[in-house]
Each structure stands twice: as structure tokens, then as C-alpha cells.
């Protein structure tokens, strides 16, 4: 059976379709059972169809699906409070994917710089081997030119330094830098763990320069490193954290987490309960 031509060929899909799954196993159309090593590419943190996840989704789906951000969302507040209680962050913004989380993190960093008199601080420093998503801006944050090929001019304001090399960072850091964006463990770059002490040095240099540190935990976060967040393995507190994948266990959700003063720089930017002419 061939893949439907109605689907854009954006991915090199294997011609296997699964009908259901349980725990670590998937079952294909022909009944063949597979041990799932991919886990939805670091998404299915609790396996397939975990009873508690199924129960939570079915319960909520039977009560209310969507209201918009015009109103309080109690369940959203509950999750945000749990994330804050178990991290160095104070504020949480929810989105739908990892790319939205990383791009949102960059927006928050630049907005914070702008709100604090640093309008010239727009540059984001990234590392070689980095992968931060596939939105137009994040294509520029990624290191590999292949990802950017054919998509026109790259978004401005991204500089790459050698992964693990502090000296290359020191050569480009300056008052034009809004933030350093880093994966504690690179995924697309080959499952590379940051060298011992590297994150601590990044954090120190960012602080000395008045820049922010963004920890991209989209793939490595939510317990995959042995701690809830990978940054917790070193004595640092990033200013912003990008989160997704395992956060929803298969349900599409991402989050931008930030320190209070950083997150508050973007408050009421898009909508307000007040009338427009008030």
C-alpha cells in the first residue's frame, strides 16, 4: 500500500501504518507487533495509551474543549503551577509545539531587552550542531544550511559559535546580544551532551554581559536526563526554558517558561480585557 498523494511529502515516511498501541508496543494494520524505540521522537514519555492520560483526555473532552485566552483556564493554571514549583521559572506561556516554544523564547528574550532599554540587544547566539525547530526564524537558529535551503532570506539576528568552545563565544558576546540559546543535550546534532561545566560557563558569561540564557529542553526535558529538566544537573538557573514533546505525552503542547521579570516583559502584549479605546 502506498502513502496517499494527498499528504505532502515533507517527511521520508516508512510505509507502515499503526492502528493502536499499548505501553512500549505498536500494532500495525497487518497485526504485526513492534517494540517502539522512537517513542514519537521523544514525545510518548509514558508510552502509548497510558491509562491515566487516556482518562484525563476523555474526561476533559466530555466537558469542555476550547474557550480561548480571553478567560481563565483552571487546568492550565494547575499545570503552570506544577511546572513553576519544580523549576527555576516563575511564569509559563503555553503553546502547541517545540518550534513555537523555542521561537517564543526568543521573542520573550528580545522583548525583555527592549523593555529594559536594550533596543540594540537583538542577537541570539546559538551553537554548531543546534536544532531548534522548523519555523522561519528557527531555521536561522539551526546550524545546518540544509534546513534553510530554498526558503529565501534567513531571519536576521542569529550567530553560531562552536559547540562546547567557550573561547569562540567570548569572541562574539557583546551588548548586542539578547540571549544565548542552547540545548543541554543536542538531539539533531548527534545526541551530544554539553561538556562538563559548559552550561555553567554559558550562564556566567550571559549574566556578566547582561544577556539571558535560554535552555532548549524541548527534547531532553521532562525527565529524559534523569532530572525533570536537564539544566538541573548543573548549578544554574536559566532565564527562559523552552519545553514540549514529553510535556504532553503525545498531546500537542509546548511551553515557554521564564523568570518573573523576564516573563512579565511580554505581558498583555497581544490581548487585553479592556476595550480598545479605553
Model-derived features: positions:
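Conserved small/polar residues in nucleotide/adenosyl-binding loops
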Residues: 270-277
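Catalytic PLP-binding core of fold-type I/II PLP enzymes
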Residues: 192-226
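PLP-dependent aspartate aminotransferase-fold enzymes
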Residues: 80-179
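Glycine-rich loop-to-alpha-helix module at the N-terminal edge of alpha/beta enzyme cores
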Residues: 5, 33-119, 123
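Short acidic, glycine-rich surface-loop motifs adjacent to enzyme active sites
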Residues: 177-190
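Active-site PLP attachment segment
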Residues: 136, 227, 235-266
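Active-site-adjacent loop/helix segments that line or gate small-molecule/cofactor pockets in enzymes
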Residues: 1-22, 70
Amino acid at each position: 500500500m502506498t502513502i496517499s498523494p494527498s499528504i505532502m511529502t515533507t517527511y521520508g515516511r516508512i510505509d507502515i501504518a499503526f492502528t493502536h498501541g499499548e505501553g512500549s508496543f505498536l500494532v500495525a494494520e497487518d497485526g504485526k507487533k513492534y517494540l517502539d524505540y522512537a517513542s514519537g521522537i521523544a514525545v510518548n514519555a509514558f508510552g502509548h495509551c497510558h491509562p491515566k492520560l487516556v482518562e484525563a483526555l476523555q474526561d476533559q473532552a466530555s466537558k469542555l474543549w476550547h474557550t480561548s485566552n480571553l478567560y481563565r483556564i483552571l487546568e492550565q493554571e494547575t499545570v503552570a503551577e506544577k511546572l513553576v514549583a519544580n523549576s527555576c521559572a516563575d511564569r509559563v506561556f503555553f503553546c502547541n509545539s517545540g518550534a513555537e516554544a523555542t521561537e517564543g523564547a526568543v521573542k520573550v528574550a528580545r522583548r525583555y531587552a527592549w523593555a529594559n532599554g536594550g533596543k540594540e540587544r537583538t542577537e541570539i547566539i546559538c551553537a554548531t550542531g543546534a536544532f531548534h525547530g522548523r519555523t522561519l526564524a528557527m531555521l536561522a537558529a539551526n546550524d545546518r544550511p540544509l534546513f534553510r535551503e530554498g526558503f529565501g532570506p534567513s531571519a536576521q539576528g542569529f550567530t553560531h559559535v562552536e559547540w562546547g568552545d567557550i573561547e569562540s563565544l567570548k569572541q562574539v558576546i557583546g551588548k548586542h546580544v539578547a540571549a544565548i540559546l542552547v540545548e543541554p543535550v543536542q538531539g539533531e546534532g548527534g545526541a551530544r551532551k554539553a561538556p562538563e561545566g559548559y552550561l555553567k560557563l554559558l550562564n556566567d558569561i550571559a549574566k556578566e554581559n547582561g544577556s539571558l540564557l535560554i535552555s532548549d529542553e524541548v527534547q531532553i526535558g521532562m525527565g529524559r536526563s534523569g532530572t525533570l529538566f536537564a539544566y538541573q544537573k548543573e548549578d544554574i538557573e536559566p532565564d527562559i526554558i523552552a519545553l514540549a514533546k514529553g510535556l504532553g505525552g503525545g498531546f500537542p503542547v509546548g511551553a515557554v517558561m521564564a523568570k518573573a521579570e523576564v516573563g512579565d516583559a511580554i505581558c498583555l502584549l497581544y490581548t487585553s480585557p479592556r476595550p480598545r479605546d479605553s
